[in-house]
């Protein structure tokens, strides 16, 4: 069954998102999963993070987003603020909010980090919107959700972590590999759309 926007919107509306228990030291972050319809398939927007010393997600493919600021009354506000800052896209003007999906606990390799990331899903209604990436973003790319869901874009990525090379399953998008935290978010997303869906493994 194809991943149409109608199917995605209905699944999100019917879904009760899972949350993690927050402790005193738990940090919160939010990302925007931005979708657009392209003829016979649905695409999602990804950013390639610029390389910065000390950033555990430096150089990774990700959804736009970041840490919750004290001034953010809601986590959804965090996702929208960070998207505007990172790629210049005003989701309140150019997008339509579809809903919240399951939160994911971040565990970057080799780091002890209590961080919970909540994804919020949007439809990009203004397909002519221009992106103006800031210095945290090296590129903005669109990837086919249908190819990820079906496993057609599954691949193996090789990454250097603390001086050692590791290989992980991921999705190929625009010459890059979506892996790690964002890969896990997508697996949660596909599992929400289809309870019988099983994660793909490139090995």
Label every PLM stretch briefly.
Residues 151:
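Active-site/pore-lining binding-face segments in mid-to-C-terminal subdomains
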Residues 1-63, 67-128, 146-148, 158-203:
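N-terminal leader/linker segments that precede catalytic domains of diphosphate-processing enzymes
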Residues 130-147:
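Acidic, glycine-rich loop-and-strand cores that form catalytic or ligand-binding grooves
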């Amino acid at each position: 069954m194809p991943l149409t926007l109608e199917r995605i919107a209905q699944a999100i509306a019917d879904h009760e998102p899972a949350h993690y228990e927050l402790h005193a030291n738990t940090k919160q972050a939010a990302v925007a999963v931005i979708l657009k319809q392209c003829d016979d398939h649905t695409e999602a927007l990804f950013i390639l993070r610029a390389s910065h010393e000390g950033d555990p997600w430096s150089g990774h493919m990700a959804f736009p987003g970041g840490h919750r600021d004290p001034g953010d009354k809601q986590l959804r506000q965090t996702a929208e603020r960070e998207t505007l800052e990172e790629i210049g896209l005003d989701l309140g003007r150019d997008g339509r909010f579809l809903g919240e999906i399951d939160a994911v606990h971040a565990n970057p390799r080799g780091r002890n980090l209590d961080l919970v990331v909540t994804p919020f899903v949007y439809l990009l209604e203004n397909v002519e919107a221009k992106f103006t990436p800031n210095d945290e973003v090296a590129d903005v790319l669109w990837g086919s959700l249908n190819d990820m869901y079906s496993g057609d874009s599954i691949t193996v990525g090789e990454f250097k972590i603390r001086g050692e090379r590791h290989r992980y399953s991921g999705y190929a998008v625009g010459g890059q590999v979506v892996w790690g935290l964002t890969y896990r978010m997508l697996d949660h997303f596909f599992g929400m759309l289809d309870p019988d869906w099983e994660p793909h493994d490139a090995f």
